[in-house]
């Protein structure tokens, strides 16, 4: 469990690295709002797609070995960026693609942890391992300060230090669960998706919760800079407060879902998120109130992430590996759409409001979709195990 958490934590830190560095990078390279948004969104999208690939690799060579390979690739990418420099939009996007490998750590950390625990504790186990997304807090807190002190180029080199240490710990203490793991093929993903409405529902649910978390985590430094004139360091601190709330709440969301049922927890999350983001879209009340709204928003989204993965093992017991990859991919695509969409709409409308209201509408859509199937799920799954639906 600890190895999964630590691996996930540091992977998320570097996956998110361009988010808190977006202000100094954009100033140095002369990027507009739309380009800046694309810069922070590309790692999210690439991480989403690569999760399927890394998940299949983990089934063939083991989650631990796959994690080691991925971590080495990320370290090499950051070292190369540090030595060669990042001096153009094209180079930033290339680095974003390579940092997407770190985002694919989802497909290693969660199965590595979850296979050790029975169904009634899946929400707690997945929540604790998934709390590794708190690595975004580390990036938001320290990356802007390090960029101010040493330049953003050197931040890439400095990031290699904790990654190397984490890799050593992971190699020494990570253990595979003593259970057989079926190898996934591309056909397995198609089999789960074709004619299976629940698979698509869960992908949509997670595209809202994790997509909202990752998208806002990447977009908020630029948002606070544009809306309230925060410098990179202050914007990073404000974002860190939001992300910390969501990261702490993820394991708590799993615990709450274990106790009250994942559907009840998730329904509450969607209503709260839609309300909070809808209010934030009006931009009234100044920086303090807006920051408070986003702290509460990411807190709810973090809890929603835990609730989703309390439900997934109940519905897809034997296909948990396949569904983890698909749902994780959907979450990443949702995060890409949110981060990029906010920037594009800001560039062309002069305001973040429309993007936020659209996201609030998607959250309401998640509530309506879940409300329509909750009774059926509770009746069908209630005899399948001890976990609450």
Which positions does each model-derived feature cover?
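Extracytoplasmic gate region of multi-pass secondary transporters
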Residues: 18-22, 197-251
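Primarily marks hydrophobic transmembrane alpha-helices of the MFS/SLC 12-helix fold
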Residues: 64-67, 266
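C-terminal ends and interior cores of transmembrane alpha-helices
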Residues: 72-86, 272-285
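Cytoplasmic helix-loop-helix junction between adjacent transmembrane helices
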Residues: 95-132
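C-terminal transmembrane helical hairpin of 12-TM major facilitator-type secondary transporters
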Residues: 261-308
């Amino acid at each position: 469990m600890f190895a999964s958490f630590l691996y996930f934590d540091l992977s998320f830190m570097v996956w998110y690295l361009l988010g808190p560095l977006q202000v100094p990078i954009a100033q140095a390279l002369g990027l507009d709002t739309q380009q800046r948004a694309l810069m922070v969104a590309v790692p999210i999208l690439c991480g989403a797609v690569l999760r399927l690939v890394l998940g299949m690799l983990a089934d063939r060579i083991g989650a631990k070995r796959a994690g080691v390979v991925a971590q080495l690739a990320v370290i090499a990418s950051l070292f190369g960026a540090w030595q060669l420099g990042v001096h153009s939009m094209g180079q930033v996007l290339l680095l974003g693609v390579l940092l997407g490998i770190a985002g694919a750590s989802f497909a290693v950390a969660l199965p590595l942890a979850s296979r050790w625990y029975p169904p009634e504790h899946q929400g707690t186990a997945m929540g604790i391992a998934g709390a590794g997304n708190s690595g975004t807090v580390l990036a938001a807190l320290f990356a802007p300060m390090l960029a101010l002190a040493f330049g953003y180029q050197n931040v890439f080199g400095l990031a290699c230090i904790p990654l190397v240490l984490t890799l050593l710990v992971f190699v020494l203490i990570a253990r595979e669960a003593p259970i057989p793991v079926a190898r996934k093929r591309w056909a397995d993903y198609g089999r789960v998706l074709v004619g299976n409405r629940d698979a698509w529902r869960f992908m949509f649910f997670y595209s809202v919760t994790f997509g909202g978390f990752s998208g806002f985590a990447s977009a908020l430094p630029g948002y606070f800079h544009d809306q309230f004139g925060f410098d990179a360091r202050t914007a990073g601190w404000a974002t860190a407060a939001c992300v910390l709330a969501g990261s702490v709440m993820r394991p708590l969301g799993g615990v709450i879902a274990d106790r009250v049922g994942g559907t009840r927890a998730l329904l509450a999350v969607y209503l709260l998120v839609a309300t909070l983001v809808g209010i934030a879209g009006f931009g009234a009340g100044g920086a303090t109130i807006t920051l408070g709204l986003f702290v509460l928003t990411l807190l709810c989204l973090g809890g929603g992430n835990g609730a989703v993965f309390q439900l997934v093992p109940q519905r897809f017991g034997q296909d948990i590996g396949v569904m983890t990859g698909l749902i994780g991919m959907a979450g990443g695509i949702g995060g890409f759409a949110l981060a990029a969409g906010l920037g594009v709409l800001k560039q062309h409308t002069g305001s973040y409001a429309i993007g936020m209201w659209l996201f609030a509408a998607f959250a309401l859509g998640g509530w309506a979709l879940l409300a329509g199937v909750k009774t059926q799920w509770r009746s069908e799954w209630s005899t399948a195990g001890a976990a609450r639906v």
